[in-house]
């Protein structure tokens, strides 16, 4: 049996919730609750409020999503990073 087709959309993270969950507003205006994919957690990719992300939605439950990709910010090459390394 084949896997179901996932709906891929883009959105912006509005709020960081407890337990590595996020409230994301999709490009069509719908707000969903999303979680970071396993590979994003494994590689410690940080997701903050205001980040543009790609999400995958199941056709069976359109209120929950998985964040599959965080798009890079459009910053000039010489601009300082938001975080300092320790």
From Swiss-Prot:
Q: Does the keyword Nucleus apply?
A: no
Molecular function in Gene Ontology: ribosome binding; rRNA binding; translation initiation factor activity
Its keywords, alphabetically, are: Cytoplasm, Initiation factor, Protein biosynthesis, RNA-binding, rRNA-binding
Tell me which Pfam families the record gives: eIF-1a
**CC annotations in GO:** cytosol
* InterPro entries (UniProt xref): NA-bd_OB-fold, RNA-binding_domain_S1_IF1, S1_domain, TIF_IF1
- All residue ranges annotated as the S1-like domain in the record: 1-72
Q: Where in the cell is it found?
A: Cytoplasm
Name the domain of life: Bacteria
* UniProt-listed SMART domains: S1 (SM00316)
Its biological function? One of the essential components for the initiation of protein synthesis. Stabilizes the binding of IF-2 and IF-3 on the 30S subunit to which N-formylmethionyl-tRNA(fMet) subsequently binds. Helps modulate mRNA selection, yielding the 30S pre-initiation complex (PIC). Upon addition of the 50S ribosomal subunit IF-1, IF-2 and IF-3 are released leaving the mature 70S translation initiation complex.
Q: How does it assemble?
A: Component of the 30S ribosomal translation pre-initiation complex which assembles on the 30S ribosome in the order IF-2 and IF-3, IF-1 and N-formylmethionyl-tRNA(fMet); mRNA recruitment can occur at any time during PIC assembly.
Q: Which family does the record assign? A: Belongs to the IF-1 family.
From the Swiss-Prot or TrEMBL record, give the protein name.
Translation initiation factor IF-1 2
| Gene assigned in the entry | infA2
